[in-house]
A protein has these predicted regions:
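Conserved core of the PLP fold type I
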Residues: 71, 75-210
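Active-site glycine-centered loops adjacent to acidic/histidine catalytic or metal-binding residues
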Residues: 218
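N-terminal small-domain helix-loop-helix segment of the aminotransferase-like
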Residues: 4-8, 14-114, 121
Length: 218
């Protein structure tokens, strides 16, 4: 039987060497240390504007509905692997109401835990070792982390204020796009707050179709 010392010596997968501690985790520690130092000198704390963490209560109706649902025995079993039909339909209705987009709740909607899970699953599904990925700069750090974990090659493209924080399509066309499988975009944009338009999405779709690139908007 393996001893504890033997287990502790097992090396993690080599791919983990390509990723570091999550960017925002590091930053929160830096801010905490900075504020502790400032507090020791009687100075005001630094206000963290880096993460949009909710600080308000959900609507009372939502809390009551959750409590009522939690008391129903049938709600504590494993759910469908593709999500409850009612939930998928609600997502489809929301997209239709807000964006005028028609989605098939059976084949075009997949409920997930959050963006990190979705980004990694998409990367695992479409990227082989050595495939290339277009990642925005500045952009959400998880795009690069997931790409490194699947051993893809990261190609960054710049987002500039003078261009409204949109991709520079002329610059993209000058890049070597051979082997690029995925282009990550993010609108409303993090961290700039820039919004997209129908024109931008139309250009992204056209760019993806012409170059055989999967456009993934987070």
């Amino acid at each position: 039987m393996p001893q504890m010392n033997d287990i502790m010596m097992i090396r993690p997968a080599k791919r983990t060497e390509s990723v570091q501690e999550y960017y925002f985790s590091r930053k929160l520690k830096e801010i905490a240390a900075m504020n502790a130092d400032r507090a020791s000198r009687g100075e005001e704390p630094v206000i963290n504007l880096g993460i949009g963490s909710p600080d308000g209560m959900p609507p009372v109706q939502a809390v009551e509905a959750l409590c009522e649902s939690a008391q129903q025995a049938g709600n504590h079993a494993y759910q469908s692997y593709v999500g409850l039909p009612q939930l998928r339909q609600a997502f489809a209705d929301w997209y239709a109401r807000w964006y005028g987009v028609e989605l098939d709740p059976k084949t075009e909607i997949q409920p997930l835990v959050g963006s990190k899970e979705a980004i990694l699953l998409i990367s695992l599904a479409f990227l082989d070792k050595g495939d290339k990925v277009l990642v925005p700069d500045p952009g959400y750090p998880t795009y690069s982390s997931a790409s490194r974990l699947v051993e893809a090659e990261i190609l960054t493209y710049d987002l500039c204020e003078e261009n409204g924080w949109w991709p520079d399509f002329e610059a993209l066309e000058q890049m070597d796009l051979s082997g690029v499988k995925i282009m990550w975009t993010n609108y409303p944009n993090m961290p700039t707050g820039a919004a997209a338009s129908e024109e931008l999405y139309a250009r992204l779709v056209d760019f993806g179709r012409r170059h055989g690139i999967l456009i993934c908007n987070d």
